[in-house]
Amino acid sequence: MMQDVSSSPVSPADDSLSNSEEEPDRQQPPSGKRGGRKRRSSRRSAGGGAGPGGAAGGGVGGGDEPGSPAQGKRGKKSAGCGGGGSAGGGGSSSGGGSPQSYEELQTQRVMANVRERQRTQSLNEAFAALRKIIPTLPSDKLSKIQTLKLAARYIDFLYQVLQSDELDSKMASCSYVAHERLSYAFSVWRMEGAWSMSASH
């Protein structure tokens, strides 16, 4: 009878107890794995924020991890703001420098205009004095180049008169009479065609 009892199969009650004891053991490893994963993720987040050089390390780690789109957007926004600030600074510097250069150009133009007016005025005064010396006809309307050519011809005419000794000592002593006679002679010389021929050359 003892052999029959030992060799008898396990009762259903004992089998259910053993199965119920094994089921918690089987269910525990997955929960342990999940808890380990949660603990690892919490350790990673805590290590990124509170480790040595946490701010710098967290920034570098966030940039390296592909699964952080929020940090990438923040980086882009900060970079865009920095670029706009630098561009605004450049615009302010260029805007501050442009009025000075414009004022300098204006002053240079004004000074150049003043110098040009002074030069033109002095030149006109010199030609007016030269026209008073050269014997001219009432109908003459000489330009500046014609006045210079006429003055050169008048100097040449005076040289020829002095070389020919046509004037006596009495006429030479009276400057007014000599000037009138030379003016008349030069006018005749012009009317004869010498001036028109010389002006054409």
From Swiss-Prot:
Biased composition annotated in UniProt, kind: Basic residues: 34-43
Keywords, sorted A to Z: Activator, Biological rhythms, Developmental protein, Differentiation, DNA-binding, Myogenesis, Nucleus, Repressor, Transcription, Transcription regulation
A Pfam family assignment: HLH
Transmembrane regions: none
Region of interest: Disordered: 1-104
SUPFAM superfamilies hit by this protein: HLH, helix-loop-helix DNA-binding domain
Localisation per UniProt entry: Nucleus
Residue ranges of every copy of the bHLH domain listed in the record: 107-158
Keyword Nucleus: yes
Compositional bias ranges of the Gly residues kind: 46-65, 80-98
Ribosomal protein keyword on record: no
GO CC field: nucleus
Cleaved signal peptide residues: none
Swiss-Prot/TrEMBL GO biological process terms: cell differentiation; muscle organ development; negative regulation of DNA-templated transcription; rhythmic process
Annotated stretches, region: Sufficient for transactivation activity: 160-190
Compositional bias of kind Low complexity: 1-18
PANTHER family reported in the protein's UniProt record: BASIC HELIX-LOOP-HELIX TRANSCRIPTION FACTOR, TWIST (PTHR23349), TWIST-RELATED PROTEIN 1 (PTHR23349:SF64)
Biological role: Acts as a transcriptional regulator. Inhibits myogenesis by sequestrating E proteins, inhibiting trans-activation by MEF2, and inhibiting DNA-binding by MYOD1 through physical interaction. This interaction probably involves the basic domains of both proteins. Also represses expression of pro-inflammatory cytokines such as TNFA and IL1B. Regulates cranial suture patterning and fusion. Activates transcription as a heterodimer with E proteins. Regulates gene expression differentially, depending on dimer composition.
Protein name: Twist-related protein 1
